[in-house]
Amino acid sequence: MGILGLSKLIADLAPQAIRESEMKHFFGRKVAIDASMCLYQFLIAVRSEGAQLATVNGDPTSHLMGMFYRTIRLLDNGIKPVYVFDGKPPDLKSGELAKRAERREEAEKALKAATDAGDDAGIEKFNRRLVRVTKEHAKEAKELLTLMGVPYVDAPCEAEAQCAALVKAGKVYATATEDMDALTFGSTKLLRYLTYSEARKMPVKEFSYDKLLEGLAINNREFIDLCILLGCDYCESIKGIGPKRAIELINTYRDIETILDNLDSSKYTVPENWNYKVARELFIEPEVADADSIDLKWVEPDEEGLVKFLCGDRQFNEERVRNGAKKLMKSKQAQTQVRLDSFFKTLPSTPNATNAAKRKAEEAKKSANNKKAKTSGGGRGRRPK
């Protein structure tokens, strides 16, 4: 779920915290990517296109196709991805998971009704709602990444929290996910739409943590309380308090405790046994692996291993897989060259520098012409002795 309404709130009140760029803008950057979010995107994208990629046994392979080609695209653009996989969800998330299970049951019933009615649009809609990333999907994705020479991290708990820890430790530049709670976990940079398909033509949207705090006129603790008021995965929110009212309350009272002391109980009902304090602690001190002990290495791909893994039962085209492996190798060599070139930087030619050089050349030419004219003119004007 992430944080309800946070993206729009930032766009409205702290637009300076958002920048849209092309993927190539992040050339040379290391980025921690929410793997489960990616796999989900790949699974629903194929369903929406009406295709069903599968093995000879009927097992889906769209997540592998998406991971393979999307990762190659990132590397082609000079981005070094590290994928972070979810671990066990925190106990406080059980309520949200229960709601998702209920929604899944409702979607199954709606899908059956749509199928019986021959409603193609309804079938597609509810099919998408039933998509979920399984442990088997994650296991296969990890095996694929290993063969591609791309690192991954198993988070002990939430992937977004682990991504944020890698960013804060300086291991990577940003977190790439569609869930805004990466900011709540303290990721200084958040990239949305980075792993979207090229066909969607969506610019990458970069959120700056420091600039959003400045724009909203709050500190990091107050930002966490704001996110809890907006609605997060770990506890209920106060009904009737939307984004605008939430930021007004935080700006006025600075924390949830003081807000509760001053809240009009006739207008707003606080959830019974509201676990906002535990939710706050989960954002402040999430369960993550020590980022400093994580060694991220991008190595050469195993071409034959990729062919064996993706072709055969999974029915990938061998020629395309080998071409993909060659692109992986080429991108690694290019990144190595970039590191070498960084030791011998050439100053770019700027308009001012170019104009100055032109003026200097013109002045030198004019001076030479004047000198020549003076010399030749003097010769003609002198009388012979």
From Swiss-Prot:
PTM notes: Phosphorylated. Phosphorylation upon DNA damage induces relocalization to the nuclear plasma.
Protein location: Nucleus, Nucleolus; Nucleus, Nucleoplasm; Mitochondrion
Region feature (I-domain): 122-253
Domain of life per record: Eukaryota
GO biological process, one term: base-excision repair
Chain segments carrying region N-domain: 1-104
Pfam families, alphabetized: XPG_I, XPG_N
Compositional bias (Basic residues): 368-385
The UniProt record lists the keyword NADP: no
GO cellular component terms, A-Z: mitochondrion; nucleolus; nucleoplasm; nucleus
Positions contributing to Mg(2+) 1 binding: 34, 86, 158, 160
UniProt keyword Secreted present: no
Cofactor note: Binds 2 magnesium ions per subunit. They probably participate in the reaction catalyzed by the enzyme. May bind an additional third magnesium ion after substrate binding.
Residue ranges of the region described as Interaction with PCNA: 336-344
Entry binding sites for DNA: 47, 70, 158, 231, 233
Broad class of where this protein is predominantly found: nucleus
Subunit structure of this chain's protein: Interacts with PCNA. Three molecules of FEN1 bind to one PCNA trimer with each molecule binding to one PCNA monomer. PCNA stimulates the nuclease activity without altering cleavage specificity.
Name this protein carries in UniProt: Flap endonuclease 1
Species for this entry: Drosophila melanogaster
Source taxonomy: Eukaryota, Metazoa, Ecdysozoa, Arthropoda, Hexapoda
